[in-house]
Each structure stands twice: as C-alpha cells, then as structure tokens.
Amino acid sequence: MNTTSNLKIGLALGSGSSRGWAHIGIIRALAEQGIRPDIVCGTSVGALVGAAHVAGNLDRLEEWVRSLTRLETASFFELNSSFTGFVNTSRLRKFLERHVAKADTRIENMAMQYGSVATDLESGREIWFTKGPMLEAVWASISLPGLFPAIRHEGRWLVDGGLVNPVPVSVCRALGADVVIGVNLNGDIVGKHLAKTPKKEKKNGVAEAFSNLVKEYAGPLFSFSEEQDEPPGLFDAIAGSVNIAQERITRSRLAGDPPEILLAPKLSHIGLLELFRAEEAIEEGRKCVQRAMPEIDFLLQKM
C-alpha cells in the first residue's frame, strides 16, 4: 500500500529469541497485502530477521529455520573456555554469513534503510547501528548476556538491545518513518516459559542415545521436563528473568512512543531457546497480520 502513497513505512521488529521467527511470517503476510516497508529496524532476533530481509536472504533463512531440529539447536550451545557465554561463536558466525548477510555486507548499501539496537554494558545506554557492517550490527543486538559473549565496538562492550529498547519504534522514526508497524513478541510471556513442547517422535538406535545425552546435559535449555512441579533449571530461570524484564521494559517504551500499528503474535507457548519451533512461530506471525488487516487498511487509507 505504500507503493501508492508517499508515506514511508517503518517496521520495528521486536526482541524475543525463538519467538522471533514469527517476524518471517509477518513480513511475508504484509508483502502479500502490498505492504513493503521502506525502513526495517530490529532488536535482538528482530535485528537478525530484519537484516536477512533487507539483505535479500529471507528465503534462505526461512528454509533453514523450518528444517532446524531440537538436536541441531542444542549443537549451537557449549560452555566456552573463557566462560563468557554458552554459544558456539564459530558456528554462529558461519550461520549468520550463510543465512543472514555476507561478511562484507554494509548497511548503507542496502535498498531499504536498516537499523539495529544494542546496549552499552557499562553505561546502560542504547546504541544504534544504522551504517557499517551488517553482521556486526546483528551480532551486537543478539548478544543476550549469559548466553552470548559481549561484543567489543568502538571501545564499548555491547550486549542485547532488548535490555533497553525491545521494540525499536524510536529508531524507525529517527530514520524517517511516517507510519510505524511495531511487533511486540513479549506481550503474553510472563510466567508461561515452562509450557510443554509438542511430543517428540520416537527415536531409536544412535539417534535415541544421542538425544538422551543432549537431554541430560542440555535439558534446561528446552522444555524437556515432564513434571511441571520440578524446580526450574538454570535456563528456565534465565528465561523467566528475561521475560519479566523485557515485558516490563516493552510496556514502558511502547507507552512513551507507541507505533501507529502494534502487532502482538500469541507465542507464550514457545520457550526462550526453542528455535526448532519455527513453523509454529511463522504461522502465528501470518495469522497475527491477518487479524490486524482491518485496522491496518483503515489507518493507511486514512493517511
């Protein structure tokens, strides 16, 4: 619809880890309705999906996340020798270069405007990336403390932007957006991160043995527990803490700078690191846009 007007449409893709695959469905559904943003800004996983879209790699990213399994997800995590995080950074970099943007991709060379948000670990200030290497902008924005090592940039240690600006409406406006569509992944998550995942298919042989090994050592990463009365594991506790903090910050930021349109996919059943549940998240992203289309149509026609 922005193709028939002079409005600059901004898309603010919020933080939310595994729930962020819903951004793929949202981008697809908006495009099907003729809504193609001029400006894409993202925080954390929103920065990652947004970068893939702006760099022309959304198809490649979607194909990969739809094929991701529980065991492949677990392979991204290991305690590194310096005890700075649990993410295999070498594997993550290869993934980003293959499915998000090439190492030499620069933000200012893209056809769409792009921005990401990170947090200065020392001062607590938000840092915006609107030019320079795209992968650096993504990496800084997704560096969730405790899981990802902080990234050094211009003398600062940077971590996940969701700590300060979970839905970067302000970045879209600063880049010139007349209308901002915000995506909040944190609206219904507090207290629900322990929801069970769909039942797994039965494995046998080596696959089953390996699955059991992963379950033993990486179980707290996902919803392996059969008993909801068990005390939360390490990553359940991290997930709950992150959910509470981001929900409160999101509410505060959106109250002060609301987007013209706010999309809130229903994703409370997907845990912090359940990256293998992409199909559910993408489908809910599509449904979220479909539910909001009467409001979106009305607003854009009025403007």
Label every PLM stretch briefly:
Residues 1-43, 51-303:
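Patatin-like phospholipase
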